[in-house]
């Protein structure tokens, strides 16, 4: 795009220098601390799709680069690495706390996902989300206040519309808020998430490399039944 990438500064800390390079500005101490906390909170989280992809590739004997490329490919999906920006876009669409419940009803009626809410593992509040919420509230401002109010309204609406499946704010909901507060451009939300998770990918690949067995999950056929033989007379 004709933009010049800023070179890294080895004299700076990791979070400080990363924030300087992605924002183009000299970061403030509170922004550095917020991004540092975000990077630590999201660096690893079990066998997510990208981590499992990395380990599967590593189990074939492929090198680290191949495993990380596969992880990035899985991470590019909007339901995984692209979720923080979409969650913040949803917050933009809602606009105010009194719009939250009607907005949720519209999404559910249309069969669309409510980005920033629900998790395949957690059936309660995501502990990472609670920590990021605390970071956002400590920073304060209209965006943090709106996020907290919208979270309460959306969770109440989802409890009404989906009583058999409790859905709570996940890590992506407040991740976007924290990154926005710290001055990270929205186009860099997913790369920032990727920078954090790369630490976990590397650790998982190194661990997988110690096991010489290839990962080959068992599949269960769910298609139409086999044709019945017709007797020949």
Q: Which stretches of residues belong to each language-model region?
A:
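Non-transmembrane, aqueous-exposed alpha-helical and coiled segments at domain scale
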Residues: 1-233
